[in-house]
Amino acid sequence: MSAEHPGTAWEHIGEKVSALSGNGPDYVDVFVQSGAGHSVTFEKGRIEEVSSAASGGVGARVLLEDHSVFSHSPDCSVSGAADCLEKVLSRARLSSSGKTFPCKVSISFDPTRLKVPDVSPFGQLDKAIRASSPFVRQVTLRHRVSGKRILVVRGDGNLVFDERFHSLFAVQVTVEKEGTIQTGYEVRAFQSEAGAFWDRVSPTQVGMQALERALLMLDAIPCPAGRMPVVLSGEAGGTMIHEACGHGLEADIVQKDFSVYRDRLGEKVASPLVTLVDDPSIEGAYGSYTYDDEGTPSRMNVLIDRGVLKAYMTDVQSARKGGIPLSGNGRRGSYRNLPIPRMSNTFLLPGKDNPASILEKAGRGLFVTKMGGGQVNPTSGDFVFQVTEAFLIENGRVGRPVRGATLIGNGPEALMKIEAVGDDLHFEPGMCGKDGQSVPVTDGQPSLLIRDLLVGGCDISDAES
């Protein structure tokens, strides 16, 4: 990340945007982006796919009282930004100052700054995984690196410049035993350049963990169905919190009356053990940034404080509409998209309970260590989540692995039923999709005990037979 100044040519556009925002429309801003990326897939003992791409452009927006006007262009030069701004002003039926903007500076990202991923260790890792078990049928290794520069000309005329790098390494292992096929998946992703990324990531460790997950599920029994205590480990990664709670706290969803948390600021919405935060300022986390895509500085936002709803995540439009503070959560998939409120690094703060004591407190039930996909209705809070790795809790201890489990419930009700929160906060990276836009995020949680939750699986008598 950098605080490098983009140059005086952009300041002319800043002066114009500032003058416009103070005379007519509610808000005017310009977003400029330039970036590049590389991706490598290693499969079947060889490099299967290599791709590289570079892209850039500009988006200009005018916020009026009840709607927004937006235009974008693939030209990220100063003159391209000026032309795009003129176009959106024309569409919004606003007059410009008639100034011209000299094209002296470009924020173009130099693709040569991104090193092509070194895949020389991948062959050795592939062989090591296959040699570790006769049941291995497929090994897939993926590595992605990307970098981009952004410039935001804010509504007050100020310029915000930022650089962002992301690196990801993922391993998927498929195993087969007596006709049963299972897959293990493990991923590491941070906001960092490739060199710093590999300083903190061991490819061998990631690969072997993926293999262990796959092999574990080969001997799993069908999951019993019914209501029972559920312990979500830190490794479950906060997926349920992200989906069943986080999206409902994004202000645009709240204002469209699609959220179960609408008009509930100051009310108790969770157990007093629950404090939920969103923090894009965490150094190196996959969902981090110094400024959001509207130029608002990042900061930690406490959304739920000891069970009480304190804040929503906002962008400029939703903050103005609701008369609520800017939280720094205005994000875009690219320059082609309007900013919308999005999560960044969203997690429950750790508690004081030892994870082993949480299992003892549960006594019996389901211990979830890896979550899959699911569906959530933000209006009601109802959810259904797949579980990719879980164990029975038997006499307060981890028991047999189970497969085919689903978690069925209601977000606010589940938050109210949290009876213990561990001291073992764990983060998992991912990509979050909303309104056709995808952005990097991190979800996190410590181990926690939900008093009772409906678990879908098979009939209990079938599992015991």
Language-model-detected regions and their locations in the chain:
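N-terminal small-residue-enriched
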Residues: 1-465
